[in-house]
A protein has these predicted regions:
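N-terminal glycine-/serine-/threonine-rich beta1-alpha1-beta2 phosphate-ribose binding loop
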Residues: 1-130, 142-154
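Extracellular structured ligand-interaction cores
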Residues: 36, 114, 182-184, 214, ...
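Structural recognition of the beta-strand scaffold that forms the well-ordered cores
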Residues: 38-42, 63-67, 106-107, 129-130, ...
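Glycine-enriched catalytic-core subsegment of oxygenase/oxidase enzymes
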Residues: 54, 64-67, 71-81, 250, ...
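Secondary-structure transition/capping motifs at alpha-helix termini
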Residues: 58, 147-153, 176-180, 262-266, ...
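A structural signal for well-ordered alpha-helical segments within the folded catalytic domains
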Residues: 115, 119, 142, 164-168, ...
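A contiguous active-site-proximal alpha/beta segment in oxidoreductase catalytic domains
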Residues: 127-129, 135-211, 216
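Rossmann-like dinucleotide-binding domain that binds NAD(P)(H)
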Residues: 211, 215-300
Length: 395
């Protein structure tokens, strides 16, 4: 197990010093016609497993390195069994010492370790697919953007839903002026996905399993005792030290098409309502009202986008203009336009509402947009450095 002081000092230095502390690999290297992209995966369980297996399904890819702080069956164990030819590591820093062993990195760790791993990878000239949310803080996101541009690497944030037909169809409906200028937007996530909300940090500790490198799991976060099923492997999303809460977990999926559809930039004002919070956990619910500068697609000089999260929390139906027969999905958005509404959700198809305007309207279907968000860094993208969906500089 790594020494906490040396590890955190190293990570702090690499994050703050940024691009100045590493030397990028040269782009003079040219991949041959039959070359395969060598992939290293940091984080091999949960979402890391699906990212890894989806990427490895491409004949253009060879999995050459696996890294996870958990050596048990459901993490590094299963990955090593499926890809026995790959080198194995429990410390990403040791992996990065073998920089000739891989061309690109998949980073599928808890949120707080996204930037501390992705930044050094880019500084080594490695292409990076990093899971959403891109970083734990705004400062880290800005550093990631600078590094991606400086080292001219292919990057992607792993918000796979951005590629789905429903999302891109909803964007097209707005861009085509189908519902007129948009007046307001309501977006929601009615409870966490796959993890349970808690009130406070439990007391006590338990022995650390031999297969778990707990100190390396904590990474840049403050030290805390190990408790099974409280942090690792999935419930870390409750904790401010490790995640960005419900808004960070699913806002990147649900608000993404809103930003794309309306071409939004930075908000002018943000007003949040939530129960009292402490230094450990995220609140169980929140309502966040954003006011953005208007665009050519909005009805006014500004537009209000309201976010709702928490168990069974939805926008009030009054004022949405939706038919009574329409049941709000567990997560999604309603964009209210001058001529009607567009409903969009990761749970289903894009829809339009306003019987008098859309009685015979047929919704166009935008084909599924395959990208690095769905299949990992492709050899063609690495060769040409072509622009992909959801790049690190974009986010």
């Amino acid at each position: 197990m790594s020494r906490p002081s040396s590890r955190r000092a190293f990570l702090k230095h690499s994050l703050v010093a940024g691009a100045a502390t590493w030397t990028a690999a040269s782009w003079s290297r040219v991949y041959g016609a039959n070359s395969r992209l060598k992939i290293a995966s940091v984080g091999t369980g949960g979402k890391g497993w699906s990212d890894l297996t989806a990427t490895a399904a491409s004949p253009q890819v060879e999995v050459t390195a696996l890294c996870d702080i958990d050596e048990s069956k459901n993490f590094l164990g299963q990955a090593a069994e499926k890809y026995p030819q790959a080198q194995r590591f429990t410390d990403w820093r040791r992996l990065f010492e073998h920089k000739k062993a891989f061309d690109a990195v998949i980073v599928s760790t808890p949120d707080h370790m996204h930037a501390p791993i992705s930044l050094p990878a880019m500084q080594l000239g490695k292409h990076v697919q990093c899971q959403k949310p891109l970083t734990h803080t705004v400062f880290e996101a800005r550093q990631m953007r600078l590094a991606a541009k400086k080292y001219n690497v292919v990057t992607q944030m792993g918000n796979q839903i951005q590629s789905h037909e429903a999302y891109r169809t909803a964007v097209k409906l707005v861009h085509d002026g189908t519902i007129g200028k948009v007046k307001e937007v309501h977006s929601w996530q009615s409870g966490p996905v796959g993890w349970r909300l808690v009130d406070d940090r439990p007391a006590g500790s338990q022995p650390i399993p031999e297969t778990l490198h707990w100190d390396d799991w904590l990474g840049v976060a403050p030290t805390r005792p190990y408790l099974p099923k409280i942090y690792h492997s999935f419930n870390w999303r409750n904790w401010r030290d490790f995640s960005n809460g419900q808004l960070g977990d699913f806002g990147c999926h649900i608000l993404d098409p809103v930003f794309m559809a309306l071409k939004l930039t930075a908000p002018l004002t943000i007003k949040a309502e939530a129960p009292a919070m402490n230094n450990d956990v995220w609140t169980k619910w929140a309502t966040v009202a954003y006011e953005f500068p208007g665009t050519e697609l909005t009805a006014g000089k500004t537009i209000k986008v309201t976010w709702y999260d928490g168990d069974d929390r939805y926008p009030a139906r009054e004022g949405l203009g939706l038919p009574e027969s329409y049941k709000l999905p567990a997560s999604g958005s309603v964009l209210i336009g001058e001529l009607g509404q567009v409903g969009n959700s990761p749970c289903g198809d894009a829809q339009t509402f306003s019987p008098e305007n859309f009685a015979e309207f047929k919704i166009p279907i935008v084909p599924y947009a395959r990208s690095l968000a769905s299949r990992g860094p492709t050899l063609a993208a690495v060769k040409t450095r072509r622009r992909l969906l959801s790049t690190t500089p974009d986010h």
